Amino acid sequence: MNVYTPDIDKLPNRDEAATALATLRAWAQTASAAEIETLDPSVARLLPGDPSDYPSLARAYPEEFSVDAAYKDSLPDLQNGPSSLIRGAKAQIQHVGISNFRLPIRFHTRDNGDVTLETSVTGSVSLEAEKKGINMSRIMRTFYGHADETFSFEVIERTLDAYKSDLESFDARIQMRFSFPMKVESLRSGLSGYQYYDIALEVVDVNGQRRKFMHLDYVYSSTCPCSLELSEHARQFRGQLATPHSQRSVARVSVELTCGADDCLWFEDLVELCREAIPTETQVMVKREDEQAFAELNAANPIFVEDAARSFCLALQRDDRIGDFRVVASHQESLHSHDAVSVLTEGPTFASDSLDPRLFQTLFHVG
């Protein structure tokens, strides 16, 4: 006699599961609460309507609710959790924090007392390999603790000390970015107007060494020396009117400051160093006589992008308040469909074998 033994380990398919679910739901609709509890309390969730063990939640915002110390202590704090919560490799993170939180900040200036400017702040700290994360709101709270002061590098350093302590980190960094106004005279008409310079101040504390940096975007006109000579050749040999091509150009000048409070490098000082290197800065207020003067100034100072980098370099080398530096220049060509670019560094601070793929795309003056 043959005896057939079914495969008891076979998993049910979807149709079999649906049939079993319908059977269980039909039984639950006629069973008592005690019977359901005896079988499995979760069966109650198969019944229509609200599950019996699901809480009724308030939907109105509790305006009168206040947080006391006990409630605050009960709140989960995942970022300060154990290292077992870390996802990915247990590796040190060099910078973690917040970027582009904005607030009005008052700054010292060389020529016009104190000015209040909208400032974008980036604050970050290092994170040890065994720590889950940081409480990022502490960076903002710490910064706001100093926000009413008139900022200088000394105030930035005190702020840095505070949030290194608050976040219990070894390394830290603050960068403050703003648009700084300076009144600029026209070339010949006697008019004046405000030129705005994108400036960033940065304090970095790594391995117990603290360093201060200033970054400036300087916008100027560059006339191509080759195009100038070719235009003159057409005029001289063929009597043909021709104009050289020139274009708006941007140099991002980053300098490490070695000076102290008594001999600081002011915002205005760095602008003037750049203007000394390349005098064809774009103009603010322009009448006809100023436009003619600007054409003459460009003709007297034709410049390739290589010349621009080296001209800035010479001006920066001559200032004892400046240590390492970097110049990134972009001539946004009116002749070509591409730009001409150059990068010059002095000292190890800014030296790099690799460049941010979008570095030169950030060198645009958008007005």
From Swiss-Prot:
Keywords: Hydrolase. The keyword ATP-binding does not apply. One of its GO terms (biological process) is tetrahydrofolate biosynthetic process. It catalyses: GTP + H2O = 7,8-dihydroneopterin 3'-triphosphate + formate + H(+). The record marks C224 as: May be catalytically important. Pfam families: GCHY-1. Pathway: Cofactor biosynthesis; 7,8-dihydroneopterin triphosphate biosynthesis; 7,8-dihydroneopterin triphosphate from GTP: step 1/1. InterPro entries: GTP_cyclohydrolase_FolE2 (IPR022838), GTP_cyclohydrolase_FolE2/MptA (IPR003801). Converts GTP to 7,8-dihydroneopterin triphosphate. Belongs to the GTP cyclohydrolase IV family. This is GTP cyclohydrolase FolE2. It comes from Dinoroseobacter shibae (strain DSM 16493 / NCIMB 14021 / DFL 12).
